[in-house]
Design a protein with these regions (language model features):
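Beta-strand-turn-beta hairpins that frame and shape the catalytic cleft
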Residues: 1-7, 125-132
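N-terminal active-site segment of His-dependent metallophosphoesterases
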Residues: 1-53
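Active-site neighborhood of phospho(di)ester-bond hydrolases with catalytic His/Asp-centered motifs
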Residues: 9-10, 34-38, 65-69, 135, ...
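Active-site environment of divalent metal-dependent phosphoester hydrolases
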Residues: 13-17, 42-45, 71-75, 141-142, ...
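Active-site neighborhood of divalent metal-dependent phosphoester bond hydrolases
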Residues: 43-124, 130, 160
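Short, well-ordered beta-strand micro-motif
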Residues: 124, 134-136, 210-214
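Cytochrome P450 core scaffold surrounding the K-helix E-X-X-R motif
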Residues: 142-148
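Conserved beta-sheet core of the metallophosphoesterase superfamily
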Residues: 149-221
Length: 222
């Protein structure tokens, strides 16, 4: 099917209020293809709502929900333990865990973990002869997509946006735009075909942002 719009939504981080605000603006339908860039949980106050929303909407054939590094930390916590697990709670996982402990039974928790584990780490599309790669954090420069390691796809920062020279357009989250340009809560298009879509959803003045990669139109939460 030829979609009228191809949209990507950046990091959500438990801000269901901001998620609802931006989603209500985009006029989503079966004629729209939507990619979620991950990080549905942690730091906000409605992490479970955001995760459940992603679980529901990703069942649609025109929606792809990627895994973020915060979902990966959650998996480590519940499935691995040890050193890897220790980083989740201090990075906002404490709020998510409190909600899971209060509202989820074991079956519901396992369903959420299966959902996270099944999330792809990237999504690639070719539209009008242009390649687009959607990924949570970025890509290891000078490395084919099929050879990318999980850690880079979920965690990379400066090495990617300073060193990427690929021909594909890359749409990613993970690094909040205020970290690149102070007090800028708006998507950034870099010179090397990278679009940064994490606009600080968990921050006081932050936003959740959505972009149409075909038109360049941007929507943001109130």
């Amino acid at each position: 099917m030829n979609y009228r719009r191809v949209l990507a939504i950046g990091d959500i981080h438990g801000r269901y209020d901001r998620l609802s605000s931006v989603f209500n603006k985009i006029n989503f339908s079966s004629k729209v293809f939507l990619i979620l860039l991950g990080d549905y949980v942690d730091r906000g106050n409605e992490n479970l709502h955001c995760l459940q929303w992603a679980m529901r909407i990703s069942k649609l054939p025109n929606v792809v929900a990627l895994r973020g590094n915060h979902e990966q930390m959650m998996l480590y916590y519940y499935l691995l333990g040890g050193t890897e697990a220790a980083i989740w709670l201090p990075n906002g996982g404490d709020k998510t865990k409190a909600e899971l402990d209060r509202w989820c039974n074991e079956e519901e928790l396992n369903r959420a973990l299966r959902f996270i584990n099944d999330r792809p780490l990237y999504h690639k599309m070719t539209i009008g002869g242009e390649d687009y790669i959607f990924v949570h954090a970025g890509l290891k420069p000078n490395k084919p997509l099929e050879d990318q390691d999980k850690e880079s796809l979920l965690w990379i920062r400066e090495e990617f946006y300073n060193g990427y020279r690929g021909s594909a357009n890359v749409i990613c989250g993970h690094t909040p735009t205020p970290f690149i340009e102070r007090n800028l809560y708006y998507p950034i298009r870099l010179w090397n075909k990278i679009t940064l879509l994490d606009t600080g959803s968990f921050m006081r003045d932050g936003k959740i942002s959505c972009i149409d990669i075909l038109s360049g139109m941007i929507w943001q939460s109130d």
